[in-house]
Structures are given as C-alpha cells and as structure tokens.
C-alpha cells in the first residue's frame, strides 16, 4: 500500500542537475527551532497551546525542533516517531510535560499529513512532466509553456533548503508522510529538524505545480516564495500565512484598473424573470470607458502596511508594477489576477481541537439593543410570544418566522406521512452523531439499548443509533435532548480549523420544525442559493451578473455567525414565532411520531391554563429548552492525552440539519428590514434613499448561510456614487451591531460569493482552494485504502479542468499522477502479499483523456470528454476508421459478422491494446465490500426490522407501501417481462442503510485482499466485449459539421485562463458561452419527484418512471410503484399524469439509459449544445437507418446526448453534430434498449 514506512526515492538529487537562474535567499531563522515546551501550558489540568510572543489566536503548530522527543523506527533508523516513554507517560501516567510533548508531536504530524500523498511524489510528477518538452500537437494555437524548472524560484528554494538536510551525499526529507501521520528525520547531534520546514516544502511544491500549470511568471512565483519564507521564519507558520492571506487579493482582484487608460470589453448580462429560476441572458457587450472604472480605491496601502511588518514591501511593489501593465480589462489582465490569487498558500490548517473549542465556543456577541422584557407575553411552556410593543428588526424577524410557520402548518403536504418520513430520515447517514453522549443520557434514565454489533454496521454512525432508538417512544427519549454533543473537526484551506457539533438523533428530531420553517422562508420570501463544495453546484452566472457594470456589488459576510445566533436575540423570538404560527394547526396532531402534549399557558396572568399543543409545537417546546440551556460540548481531544472535558456553550450547533437553512433565513430577513425600513429612516443622502426605494431582497440580496451579496442596481447608465456607497456600508455595519451581528462588508468592484470570484463578468478561478498537493485529513490517525488514491488523482484532474489550468500540461501532469496511483499492494498479517495494477484504459474510462493513441495526432481528445461509457464511445468513434483499417490488415476476418465492426476483428485488436481489460477493471468497486459471512444473520435481521419500524412507524405510510408493493408484484406477475424487473421501494431502504453503515466501518483485511484480487482479475480478463449499453451506442455514427456559431465575443474575457494560450478551454467557452442558469435549478426542473427519503435516489426514481413510460406502463402500474415509495393516491395520480415523454427534458430521457451531463460541462451552456447543435438525423434527406417511429421519439434525446458527447470530446471549436447513420437501424436500437430497461 502507498504509505508504508519506506523512504521516498531521492527525488531531491534530480534538483542537483538543474542550473537555477533566480536568486532565492533562505533566512537562517527558518532553521532555528524555538523550545517546544514554551508553547504549551496546563490550565485546569487541560493542555493548552500558548504563545510566549503574545500573538492572538496563534494556536497552530509552532516552529520547534522535534528531534528531542523522537525514537528511531526499526525499519528506517534515520526516522522516528514519538518516544514510547513519552507516549506512555502521557497516556497512562498523565505527566504534564509528557502530555505537552505528545500534543506537540501529534499536532506537527497531523499538519504534515494534510496532503494527498507524500509531497515529494508531486515534485517527482512535476520533474518527470517537465523533463522533456511537450509533444507538439501540430495546431497553430498550441503554444509551448515558457515555465522551466531552472527558472522556478520555488524549486530553487526547495533545493537550497534541502542542503541543510543532506548527510553523506544523501538527502533526508524533514518528514515522510505515511498513512497514520508522519515520521520525522532524526538529525545527527548539532543539527535540528524544525517542523515548519516540512510545511514550507509542501507549500513550495504546491506553488511549483501551480506555476507550471498556469504559465506563471517567475517574478510572481518569487513573490509567493518570499512570503512563504517570511512566514516560516516566524514562530508560527500557519498563523503568519493566515495573517498575510489578504495581501494577494488586495494587490490584484481588489485593486485592478485603478490607474492608466481604462478600457476593454465585458459582457452585458440580464437576470430574467422569474428571478427564482436563476436564469440569465448574455445580451451583448459593454465597451468599458472611464465612467465605468472601479469606484473604490485600490487596496495597495492596506497590503503595504501588512507587508512592511514582515519586510515584504518590495514584494508588493513587484506585483503593483506588473499590475500597471494591465490597465484594460482583457484576457491577459484576468489571467494576471488568477495568477496572483494562486500564490496564496493552499495548506489545510490544523489546530488543536481543544483550542478550536475554547476559541470558537466561548464567543458572546455584543448586542447593543437587547429585547426589552416588556415585549414578551407571559410564558407558554418553555417559550414566550412577542406582544404589540415589539418593533424594529427583531419584530420584523418574528413576523417573518410567524407567517412562514402559519403557511407551513396550513399546507396539507407538511402533514403527509411521506414528508414526515423524508424529514426524519435526512439525518440517518453513515456519519457519526454524539452516540456515546446519547448512550450516557439513557443509562442515567435506566434505559438499555439493544445491541446490533453482530451486523458489522459502524457503531458510531447515525444508522446504528437510529436502529437502537427505533422501538422507544419519544417520551422515553426526552432526557437525551439535553444530552451532550461530541467533538468533530474540519480542517480548511485559508481558514482556521473549525470544530463541529454532530447532534444526536433526538436533538435533530426536535430541530425539524426549525428546518421546515426556514426552508419555507428561503423558498418563498428570500432569494437564497444552495451551497455545494463543487464550483458547479453554485450559481456561477449570478456572480458574473453581479460583477458587470453599471451594477455595483457589496460582498457581505456575518462574522462568527454560529456564535451570533444567540437565544436572547434570535432563537427565543424564532421559537416563539414558530410556536405561535403552529397555533393555526390541529393541536391534537402528532408530527414525526412526536405526540401532542399539554403546556401551561400564562399569557393572561389572571387566568393561566393548561392547553393542548400539537406534535410540531411539542418539538418546538423542547427545542426552545435546548437552545435556552445551551449545549454541553463533550471534548475528548485526540491530540492531547487527558484533555477530556465538558464545555458549556450558547453557540448555535454547526452539526444541526437546520444550521445552514436557518442562517440563510435570518440573513435574508434582516437584510429585508435593512433595505425597506432602516436605510430610508437613517440615510442622510437623498440619492441613496432614491436608489434603495426600488431595492428588495428578491432582486438585490442573495444569501447562503453567513454569506451575502448586495447587488446595487444602476441608475440608467450611471452607477451609485462613492459617497452613497460608503454611507450604505456604514449603515449596514451600524445596523448589525444593534442585534449582535458583526457584518464583514467589502466592496471592491469585484463580486465574491461562496468563495467564488468574478471581475467585470469574468470568473476568476480560485486555484489556491484546490491545492494539487493538499488534502484534508480531519482525524489525526487515519489510513487510506489504496484505490482511493485513484479517486484522489481523478478529483485533482477535474479540479484543474474547472480552474482552466493549461490543459495539455495539466493532462500530462495528471497522467504522471495516474501512473503512480495505478499500482497498489496489500500485506495481510498472514498469507502472501496481494498486488493490483490498473491498466491505462482504466483511467481513460474514469475520464482522463489519452494524450496519444495509435494512428492519431497528439492531444486530440478534449479534457471535456465525459467519463464512463460516454467517453469510451466518443474515443472509439473518432478512432473507428483506424481500428477498422488496422484490424482488417493485421487480423484474419471474423467468421460471423459483428453488428458494429462487420468482418473486421476489431474486438481482438481492442483486446490486444488492453482496452477491454482497463474498461472492466475500472468498474470494480474501489471500496472493500464487507463479506456477508462477516455478519450475524439474526443481528442483521433484527436491525433491519428496527430500521423498518423507524421508517414505517406511521400506519398510513406503512399501509401505502405494503399496498403499493403488493399491487406491483401482482401486476408484474400478470405481465412478466413487460416492465423493469427491479424498482426502488421504501421496503429496500433498511437494507440500503445497513449496507451503507457496514461500508462506513473500517474494512477487514480479508475484504481489502478480496477487492485487490477482483481488480487484478478484471485487469487480466480475456473478455472481448463492452457493456450492453456501450455495444448499442457503438451502432451510432456521428458526423461533425461546421463549428457552431460563436455564443460570445471571443475578445471578451469570460473565464481567467480560458484564452488563446489555453486553446481548448477558450474554444469551448466562446463556442457555447458560460452557463446561463443555476445548475441545481436546471436539474431540479428535470425531475418529476422532487424529494424522497434518505437511502433512495430521486434520479433513480425519475429514471424508473420514464423507463416505465417508454415500456408502455398503465396508470395502475405507476400508482403501484409510487405507492411503494410512500406516495399518497392523490400525489401518485398527479405525478403519473405529469409523466409525458414529449414534455420530458433531454437530459431526463438520456438518464434512462445512464447518459448524463458531466460536471466539466456545467460551467458552459450545455443545454444549448444539446438542444440546438446536436441533431438525431440530418435535415432533408436522411439515412433511412436514422428514421424513428413516432412512439419511439424518446430515442432522439439519447442520440442528441451521444452527438454532444462526440462534439465535446474533440479538441478545438465545438462543431455541430449529427447522427449520419445507425448500424442495423435506430428502431433495432430502440428494441434493444427497451429490453435492457426491463432487465435493469
């Protein structure tokens, strides 16, 4: 397995052969280690990180010599881990000095571990990739990359640093990264091994890879090297990097076009109605002129001030001088901005969990205008309502939540058993959730939990917890609501590590009303977007729209948002408003099996009384009690032995399912009052009042969680004045202070939202957030199973495509990474070693385009090639003539005519080229599958029964599912072979949960060995065929015609890096234009069924419905299937009548045969490509094999997507694609696809 204790091949010797041309000076202070014990202290028997220099929040790994606390390894004596005596003294005897030494070792090792694999491997990949010039592709626009290893300041800095780590002619890396963390070099007496050097080398390797992949100028690369070296000479590298991270955006993105002759072009973008659809239109070009120059001053002085303290003033001046070469908005200027932003360190920052908790969860906001006691009515149980005296922003917040709660409780769908099942299953996942604390709370109540350990399901998972609690009534579980929550950690890039609170199931259950009402607010009252980790999930066109003049954008962020949502200012009014809103409902109704209850109502002090409240209100009562008391955070710090304590906090729990949607609802509601009431009442400027008069949160404020973007509209062609802009920002800051929010407000004539950036309508990929080397490892000791490295390599490649890295160079680098990742071995404790090797074609199947295939010119396949059968179809399609000719000349003809290759023995040729072996090996699961023999059948059955009880506790839902399943069985038995043999059902969900829970647990060695053998077996298989679907796709012949008309002006920058130097990205962007709609909204609109329970996939449900339609299902068959997934008769009838093959979207129909839009297309206008530039047959005289019968018109969508796949998989401009012919005729394909659908 990669990561066993073995020295990395001495890649540093390769640097000895380079003649460097830059002059990097490494300060001696980088190698002077501070005494580690000065940085730790004991406070109330808790080991804490301290800063003898008095630096604020400097909790990260300090620059100290680690060698005094090491003990040599038996296998490699030059390297060591924590001395066993120190480890024992810390863990068993609790000696303070040993606990501190152990904490230092674990913190340093965990920081070193935040990489995909040992960083020297990436140095190897880079040097191998850059060792020879790239094969020229013969295309005029293929410009050689000017980056050379000899001119790289980052590589020279690495070489100079490593001279300190050279002994007897051999180099020793400061640390070797292994699965469980790091092992550290033990230097000879008189030398030190300062931990920061390892982190610095990682950052320098990361920088060198980025510089190579972006054609970064050596001058800019040197700027980053200087900053990293300056940070490494401080006592605290990560803290210094955090302090300096703003300098690069301030000197580039936030300061562009402030001087010189401004000009250039940017897109004109319109946000079409209804705005909730997030559809945008590119309606031309704006010629930029002096009146549209950025309003806000440059941030140079701010950056210079910060850099002066670190002796980096000259670095800032280099960037400023280079920036002055770009006074106009062009593809070169946005490439420059992307280059400067890429200089920010991409390190995942680690800090001790204890310090995260003490810092993050002890904050209490300053509320300047607290709620007066006379605003409240008398108590109703644990909460109170606002009375008529309430006014101002919090009264508005109350009214928003009150109205939303009324709408929710009056909506019949809220009370549908399936809706309730969807909400109660949303937190049933393989992730953990305060299980130990929940168990403790029940033990104190003398409740014994059932044991399902024989199932092999991960014990800490929510799935296991759900099964344990399934048979208990809500009443029994009430004590657990106030139970402790346990510690979770997330390490982040360019942000401090944050601790998270995973809540237990009963706590999540009572949070559901909060989620329900917040979702309503965000859907109907706010203009909120979804947040996803992938760029494609976010609303890219919104950002581009906001950044184009004459609009002005203010980027808003709520500082310490979790801590700012206090009970006093927010949660008390919200709980009161929800409870009061739910008064409109039936007080006897339970909700999610929480029964109604009686609460003491003291609103009228003269006549208090007991009154019944509904299940929803009972949940709200418990939620109010929980929020009011705050949370007890149970901290067992894995870094510091003996750091086990309970920390009370009033901070909003980050692990609640309500967190994100709740923050978004409040963010929008407070912005609503600000625009409608606060600014008109408090603004001094009459023009500002005039501008704000027409602004509202539906059109001008978009938010997600604590992030917001205020879009100020234009006044005709004029923009808001700098004075009005400054006043508006000042008012917002003052407004927030009233209720305890600190708004971090920024306006720099660029748009920033959810960590995406745009400047004058051009997306600026934030490369440093996708570091080639870095990866988050949240657990201090975590092992990776080998094939996961293959997924990591592919993920890294896709990030480079999204970020528009130089595509040929990035492809070459990605293949170097893939070659390393392709081989793995496993050493069981008993028995022989197991090896596995992926063939080249496995990576092509996974989506990595080949650089050169026999008979073709280099770099012919685009990085926009989809993965899977689609990609293989596109490659074989453009390779078809060569394959046929070579098979005809080199192999005897086939005895039986092949439906695609006729008499040419192409299957034997493909087999000899290794295509089939790679194809099938890539489809073997890369996760070890737990063996059924490892589980106790009785235990599995008991757990399945418990999970079924939880899911189907509602008798109405249970009746629907049983009725639907029986009806489906009866109908399919009556007409066997007419409909799909297997369809999703709620009865399958418990089995799926158990499988997910078993997969989440650490795999047994036997399962790992079996997976490796399966991969190797597939990689050496003698099969000579593809999947049924791909064999059918290959019947289709696609003709590429002329290039599609340009969608956008090629001179307008749309994505930084997608320019003529990076030709394929440029051709794709100019051919199609940027994505014009929210991808989430687009794909949501392609679904008949919007939501389903956790454990079922809405896309699978949707594909099943369409397959049934294609196969001619009757209404009662739809009803039976939909009842089987829990739907009411009315909802089943509505959906069944909505299923129309004529109205279904193209991507929806293509999904029925496993075709999809790959993520790489989602930043482009793929819908127009599929709809308007892909043709299922030639207009006019078509080949008779392409003529489709009317009732099989759904096949046109499949053919369109195959055409689009061929067009996008070829480099260069996107061409119109047409199906020219179909071997055997399209109607034969239709019949075969129908047969496949019945078997799937």
Curated annotation (Swiss-Prot):
Gene Ontology cellular-component terms for this entry are:
viral nucleocapsid
Q: Does the keyword Transferase apply?
A: yes
Uppermost EC category:
transferase
Protein known as: RNA-directed RNA polymerase VP2
Question: Main site of residence?
Answer: virion
Function per UniProt: RNA-directed RNA polymerase that is involved in transcription and genome replication. Following infection, it catalyzes the synthesis of fully conservative plus strands. After core assembly, which consists in recruitment of one capped plus-strand for each genomic segments and polymerase complexes, the polymerase switches mode and catalyzes the synthesis of complementary minus-strands.
Q: Which family does it belong to?
A: Belongs to the reoviridae RNA-directed RNA polymerase family.
GO MF terms listed in the record are:
hydrolase activity; nucleotide binding; RNA binding; RNA-directed RNA polymerase activity
Q: Where would you find this protein in the cell?
A: Virion
Question: What SUPFAM superfamilies does the database record attribute to this sequence?
Answer: DNA/RNA polymerases (SSF56672)
Q: Does Thylakoid show up as a keyword for this record?
A: no
Name the catalysed reactions.
RNA(n) + a ribonucleoside 5'-triphosphate = RNA(n+1) + diphosphate
Q: Where is the RdRp catalytic domain?
A: 516-764
Enzyme Commission (EC) number: 2.7.7.48
Give the GO terms filed under biological process for this record.
viral genome replication
Q: Which PROSITE patterns match?
A: RDRP_DSRNA_REO
């Amino acid at each position: 397995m990669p990561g066993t204790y073995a020295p990395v091949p001495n890649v540093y010797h390769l640097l000895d052969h380079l003649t460097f041309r830059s002059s990097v000076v490494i300060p001696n202070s980088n190698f002077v280690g501070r005494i580690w014990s000065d940085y730790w202290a004991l406070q109330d028997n808790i080991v804490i990180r301290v800063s003898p220099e008095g630096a604020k929040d400097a909790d990260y790994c300090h620059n100290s010599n680690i060698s005094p606390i090491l003990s040599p390894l038996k296998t490699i004596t030059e390297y060591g881990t924590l001395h066993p005596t120190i480890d024992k003294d810390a863990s068993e005897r609790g000696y303070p000095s040993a606990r501190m030494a152990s904490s230092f070792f674990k913190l340093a090792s965990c920081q070193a571990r935040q990489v995909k694999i040992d960083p020297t491997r990436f140095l190897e990949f880079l040097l191998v990739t850059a060792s020879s010039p790239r094969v020229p592709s013969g295309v005029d626009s293929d410009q050689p990359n000017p980056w050379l290893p000899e001119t790289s300041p980052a590589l020279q800095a690495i070489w100079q640093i490593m001279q300190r780590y050279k002994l007897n002619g051999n180099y020793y890396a400061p640390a070797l990264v292994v699965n469980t963390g790091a092992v550290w070099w033990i230097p000879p007496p008189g030398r030190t091994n300062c931990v920061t050097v390892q982190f610095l080398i990682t950052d320098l390797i990361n920088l060198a890879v980025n510089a190579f992949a972006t054609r970064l100028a050596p001058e800019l690369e040197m700027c980053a090297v200087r900053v990293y070296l300056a940070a490494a000479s401080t006592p605290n590298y990560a803290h210094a990097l955090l302090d300096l991270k703003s300098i690069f955006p301030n000197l580039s993105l936030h300061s562009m076009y402030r001087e010189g002759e401004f000009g250039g072009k940017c897109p004109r973008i319109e946000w079409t109605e209804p705005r909730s659809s997030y559809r945008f239109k590119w309606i031309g070009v704006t010629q930029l002129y002096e009146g549209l120059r950025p309003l806000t001053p440059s941030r140079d002085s701010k950056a210079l001030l910060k850099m002066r303290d670190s002796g980096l003033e000259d670095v800032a001046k280099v960037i400023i001088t280079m920036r002055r070469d770009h006074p106009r908005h062009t593809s070169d200027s946005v490439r420059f901005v992307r280059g400067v932003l890429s200089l920010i360190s991409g390190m995942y920052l680690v800090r001790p969990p204890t310090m995260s908790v003490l810092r993050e969860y002890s904050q209490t906001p300053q509320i300047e205008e607290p709620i007066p006691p006379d605003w409240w009515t008398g108590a109703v149980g644990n909460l109170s309502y606002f009375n008529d005296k309430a006014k101002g922003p919090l009264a508005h917040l109350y009214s928003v939540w009150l109205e939303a709660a009324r709408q929710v409780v009056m909506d019949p769908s809220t009370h549908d058993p399936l809706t309730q099942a969807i909400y109660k299953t949303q937190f049933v996942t393989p992730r953990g959730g305060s299980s130990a604390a929940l168990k403790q709370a029940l033990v104190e109540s003398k409740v014994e939990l059932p044991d399902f350990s024989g199932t092999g399901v991960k014990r800490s998972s929510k799935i296991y917890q759900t099964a344990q609690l399934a048979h208990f009534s809500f009443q029994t579980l009430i004590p657990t609501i106030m139970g402790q929550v346990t510690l979770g950690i997330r390490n982040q890039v360019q942000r401090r590590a944050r601790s998270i609170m995973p809540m237990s199931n009963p706590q999540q259950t009572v949070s559901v009303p909060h989620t329900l009402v917040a979702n309503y607010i965000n859907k109907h009252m706010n203009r909120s977007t979804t947040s996803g980790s992938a760029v494609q999930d976010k609303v890219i066109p919104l950002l581009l729209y906001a950044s184009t003049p004459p609009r002005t954008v203010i980027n808003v962020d709520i500082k310490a948002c979790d801590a700012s949502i206090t009970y006093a200012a927010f949660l008390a009014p919200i709980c009161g408003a929800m409870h009061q809103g739910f008064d409109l409902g039936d007080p006897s109704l339970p909700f999610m099996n929480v029964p109604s209850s009686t609460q003491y109502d003291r609103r009228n002090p003269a006549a208090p009384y007991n009154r019944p409240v509904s299940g929803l209100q009972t949940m709200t009562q418990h939620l109010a009690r929980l929020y009011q008391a705050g949370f007890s955070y149970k901290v067992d710090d894995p870094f510091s032995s003996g750091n086990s304590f309970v920390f009370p906090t009033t901070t909003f729990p980050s692990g609640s399912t309500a967190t994100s949607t709740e923050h978004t609802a409040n963010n929008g509601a407070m912005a609503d009052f600000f625009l409608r009431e606060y600014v008109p009442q408090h603004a001094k400027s009459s023009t500002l009042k005039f501008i704000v008069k027409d602004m509202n949160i539906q059109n001008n404020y978009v938010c997600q969680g604590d992030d917001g973007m205020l879009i100020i509209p234009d006044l005709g062609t004029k923009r808001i004045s700098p004075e009005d802009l400054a006043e508006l920002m000042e008012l917002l800051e003052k407004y927030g202070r009233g209720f305890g929010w600190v708004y971090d407000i920024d306006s720099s004539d660029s748009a920033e939202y959810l960590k995406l950036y745009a400047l004058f309508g051009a997306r600026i990929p934030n490369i440093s957030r996708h570091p080639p080397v870095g990866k988050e490892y949240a657990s201090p000791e975590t092992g990776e199973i080998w094939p996961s490295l293959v997924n990591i390599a592919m993920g890294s490649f896709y990030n480079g495509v999204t970020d528009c890295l130089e595509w040929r160079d990035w492809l070459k680098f990605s293949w170097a990474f893939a070659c390393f990742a392709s081989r793995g071995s496993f050493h069981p404790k008993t028995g022989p070693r197991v090896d596995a090797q992926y063939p080249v074609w496995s990576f092509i199947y996974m989506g990595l385009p080949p650089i050169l295939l026999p008979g073709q010119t280099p770099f012919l396949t685009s990085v926009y090639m989809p993965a899977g059968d689609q990609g293989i179809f596109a490659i074989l399609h453009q390779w078809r003539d060569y394959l046929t000719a070579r098979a005809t000349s080199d192999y005897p003809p086939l005895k039986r005519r092949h439906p695609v290759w006729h008499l040419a023995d192409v299957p034997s040729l493909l087999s000899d080229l290794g295509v089939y072996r790679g194809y099938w090996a890539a489809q073997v699961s890369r996760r070890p599958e737990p063996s059924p023999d490892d589980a106790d059948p009785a235990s599995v059955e008991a757990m399945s029964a418990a999970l079924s009880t939880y899911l189907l506790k509602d008798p109405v839902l249970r009746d629907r599912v049983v009725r639907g399943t029986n009806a489906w069985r009866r109908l399919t038995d009556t007409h066997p072979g007419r409909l799909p043999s297997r369809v999703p059902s709620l009865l399958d969900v418990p089995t799926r949960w158990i499988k997910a829970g078993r997969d989440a647990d650490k795999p047994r060695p036997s399962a790992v060995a079996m997976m490796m053998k399966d991969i190797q077996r597939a990689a050496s298989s003698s099969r000579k065929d593809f999947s049924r679907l791909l064999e059918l796709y290959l019947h289709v012949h696609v003709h590429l015609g002329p290039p599609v008309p340009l969608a956008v002006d090629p001179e307008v920058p749309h994505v930084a890096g997608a320019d003529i130097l990076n030709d394929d990205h440029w051709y794709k962007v100019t051919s199609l234009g940027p994505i014009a709609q929210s991808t989430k909204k687009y794909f949501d609109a392609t679904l008949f069924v919007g939501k389903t329970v956790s454990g079922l996939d809405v896309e699978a449900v949707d594909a099943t419905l369409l397959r049934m339609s294609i196969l001619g299902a009757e209404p009662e068959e739809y009803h039976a299937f939909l009842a089987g997934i829990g739907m009411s008769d009315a909802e089943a009838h509505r959906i069944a009548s909505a299923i129309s093959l004529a109205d279904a979207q193209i991507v929806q129909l293509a999904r029925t045969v496993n075709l999809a839009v790959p993520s790489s297309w989602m930043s482009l206008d793929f819908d127009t490509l599929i709809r308007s530039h892909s043709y299922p047959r030639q207009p006019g005289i078509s080949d008779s094999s392409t003529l489709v019968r009317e009732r099989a018109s759904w096949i046109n969508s499949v053919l369109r997507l195959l055409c689009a796949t061929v067009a996008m998989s070829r480099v260069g401009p996107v061409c119109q694609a047409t199906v020219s012919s179909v071997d055997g005729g399209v109607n034969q394909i239709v019949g075969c696809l129908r047969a496949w659908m019945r078997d799937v």
